[in-house]
Every structure is written in C-alpha cells, then in structure tokens.
A protein has these predicted regions:
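An extended, acidic
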Residues: 20-138
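Short, structured interface segments
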Residues: 16-18
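DPxDG-like acidic metal-binding loop motif
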Residues: 1-13
Length: 138
C-alpha cells in the first residue's frame, strides 16, 4: 500500500487518519534523536550527560524522516544543533500542526528567518521543557 501524509486546517493526516500526538510521554520512556555534531564543547558535554535519561536515542541521519516519526508518534523528540531552513521548515510545520512543539534552548519557537541553532522538537511543550531542564541541570 502507498502511504501519504498531508495537512489541512484541521490537522495532519496519514492517508485519511488524523494524527494525534501523545503529550504525556515521560523522559524515561521517550525515544528520540540527538544530533551529536556541531555543538560547542560545553553543550556537547551536557548532551552526552543527559543521553541516558531517555529510553532510546537513535538517528537515521536524516532529520526529515525523524520529523515524520515525531508526527506519527514513533519518536518523541529530536535535539538539533545546526539549523538550515531547508532541512527544518517542512518538519517543524508538520509537527506543529500535529500538536507537537518546538523551541530553542531559550524557549523561543523556531523561526526560519533567524540565524539560529540548538532546537528541541517533540510531541509536546511539556516534554520540551523537561528536556530543557535536563540540559540546564535542574
């Protein structure tokens, strides 16, 4: 069978099934990906320190696929360092419409026209802020 994902003003759909994200994921049950490239030394160290707080951390090496996984509920989060707009605009849009959340380490949402780095994208604002708390050592 052929599968297709699309959005309209009411949400994100896989074929004709509306995708609804679970916003109750606990850190210890979370599955996600972490970019381990391009961090400054201090952030890289912190990223490695928090990695084992999650159930599973893995990556395809393709953020586009990982955004789809978040929208599909197969992955809960992604922690990203370098942000080229062409890699992130479609995925951030899909995750937002599906009910997920994105924010930089300063809690501001991603804006493609700002030259920025360090983004967390997940199935919920709650999970994003829990990840930020880990990064801040709280």
């Amino acid at each position: 069978t052929e599968e297709f994902m699309y959005t309209d003003s009411n949400g994100v759909y896989l074929n004709d099934n509306k995708l609804i994200l679970n916003d109750n994921t606990k850190i210890e049950n979370a599955v996600g990906s972490i970019s381990f490239k391009y961090w400054d030394e201090e952030k890289r160290k912190k990223i490695f320190e928090i990695k084992n707080n999650f159930h599973n951390v893995n990556s395809y090496g393709s953020i586009g696929c990982e955004y789809f996984d978040i929208a599909l509920g197969q992955r809960n989060f992604a922690i990203l360092s370098r942000l080229y707009p062409w890699d992130h605009i479609p995925g951030v849009f899909i995750v937002r419409i599906a009910g997920g959340h994105d924010c930089h380490f300063d809690k501001l949402e991603y804006k493609f026209y700002n030259n920025s780095n360090n983004l967390i994208v997940s199935n919920s604002k709650k999970l994003n802020y829990e990840i930020l708390n880990l990064l801040e050592g709280e």
